[in-house]
């Protein structure tokens, strides 16, 4: 499981160096093979270990092409998906089209999300996080039923 927030720098070639605690897990879980694609709701990228992505991709491919929203989702997620290899130093090259989509230059934030990571431009992450905290404070009484019994 991947968790935690890490502030990182992309190097001059656009490579992301995964923190060592995640690097070891990626190398043992999927031999460092990951898939990066866009998040179609936010301007960030999503990184999945290859086995996780293959399961998602199977589900996406099974969606009906004649349904416009399903076809759009497939185009965005599968169309932007790139297989990446984490090298021995724990780095993976983030392809230029993906960096451009998410507005990634140097300062980035890597967010562990259980079975995947999100990669954000640092300033956009700080802005969105502040927005979400504000929204959460305003909507506290409106928790979905599934969350009402969760003690945090």
Curated annotation (Swiss-Prot):
List the CDD domains hit by this protein, alphabetically: MraZ_C (cd16321), MraZ_N (cd16320)
Instruction: Tell me any Pfam family this protein matches.
Output: MraZ
Residues spanning the membrane: none
Q: Which domain of life is it from?
A: Bacteria
Keyword annotations from UniProtKB, A to Z: Cytoplasm, DNA-binding, Repeat, Transcription, Transcription regulation
Q: Which GO terms describe its cellular component?
A: cytoplasm; nucleoid
**Residues in coiled coil:** none
Q: Where is it localised?
A: Cytoplasm, Nucleoid
Annotated SpoVT-AbrB domain ranges read: 5-52, 81-124
Question: Quick check: keyword Cytoplasm in the entry?
Answer: yes
Which BP terms from GO are recorded? negative regulation of DNA-templated transcription initiation
Listed name of the protein: Transcriptional regulator MraZ
Q: Which species does the entry assign this protein to?
A: Halorhodospira halophila (strain DSM 244 / SL1) (Ectothiorhodospira halophila (strain DSM 244 / SL1))
């Amino acid at each position: 499981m991947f968790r935690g927030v890490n502030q990182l720098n992309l190097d001059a070639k656009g490579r992301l160096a995964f923190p060592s605690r995640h690097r070891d897990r990626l190398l043992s879980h999927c031999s460092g093979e990951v898939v990066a694609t866009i998040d179609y709701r936010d301007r960030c990228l999503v990184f999945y270990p290859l086995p996780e992505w293959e399961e998602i991709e199977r589900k996406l491919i099974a969606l009906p092409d004649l349904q416009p929203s399903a076809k759009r989702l497939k185009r965005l997620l599968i169309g932007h998906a790139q297989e990446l290899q984490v090298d021995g130093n724990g780095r993976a090259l983030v392809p230029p089209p993906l960096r451009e989509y998410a507005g990634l230059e140097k300062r980035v934030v890597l967010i562990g999300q259980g079975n995947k990571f999100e990669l954000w431009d640092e300033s956009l992450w700080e802005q969105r996080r502040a927005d979400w905290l504000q929204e959460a404070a305003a909507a506290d009484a409106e928790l979905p039923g599934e969350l009402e019994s969760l003690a945090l």
